[in-house]
Amino acid sequence: ASCGCTTPRYDTRPLAPGDTALITVAYDSQGRPGRFAKSVFINANTTPPRSVLIIKGVVVGAPQTIARRFPVDFGPLKMAHSSVILGQVMRRHVKSVFTNGYNGSTDTISPTVAYAPKWLEVTPTPRDVPPGERLSLSFYVNGDRVPLYGANLDSVVIVPDSRHPEIRHTLEISVDVHEDFSKVEPRALARAPQAAVDSELINITCDGDGHAVLRLSNRGKGEPLLIRRVYTLSPALEVSVPKSGKVKKGRTADIYISMVREALPSDGRPLDARVFVITNDPVTPVITVRVTAACP
């Protein structure tokens, strides 16, 4: 059989001319809702030596099984996840990620995509999904089309059934974009910039002005250090970088980090955030700086 979920049973005794035999094939449907098609291969001393049987059908999942495997409720469309993490993709590279859904209604639905960022192609398959069957959403990302280095957060708006375009649901999307340095030659590496910061831990005092300075240096021997991006995912911090966006060899540049007091944790917990510095340093393209603050 083509998978462990399909079990054939048969008599191994030789079959005389004109005689018949029974082959029983069972499909284990537990935890596998939706359409299935499995192959069973019969090998014998015949011509041709191999025959193929197909077992197919649709498994209508029990409510508890559907709720466990597709817990996200998009109306008639049940999704396996409420967000899609595309992971890391390099510039000049592409990547595909898939997630599954299930038609939990009693009618055929035709899911469509009402919105996706320009750098992402989202395709539902199949176009029409009968009741009790699954669909696949493919996410195709081109690293050159994503606008920012590092983390990019966006969303995709799904219409579960094109006959009701007013019903829409949102899937959160994230992708982490970096430069591909895998083909940098030794001669270029010797002249490459080298990024360094004066500290990878910054504590902002609450009784001051709420600012800190991170000093970025280029310790390389040739090329300028290009600042691809400096950012934080914390709403309690703001960062600003030099307008030139580059640091010559042997020079430094200041990155200003400001605390947004009104965005600090309301329960009094200390701030523990990260600032990411992305450059064209092929050895250390990303430097992570921890920023803390404890304000009563």
Residue ranges and their predicted role:
Residues 28, 43-47, 142, 159-163, ...:
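Beta-strand-rich extracellular modules
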Residues 112, 121-123, 130-138, 143-184, ...:
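Acidic, serine/threonine- and glycine-rich low-complexity intrinsically disordered segments
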Residues 30-39, 91-98, 144-157, 168, ...:
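Short, solvent-exposed loop/turn segments enriched in Ser/Thr/Gly
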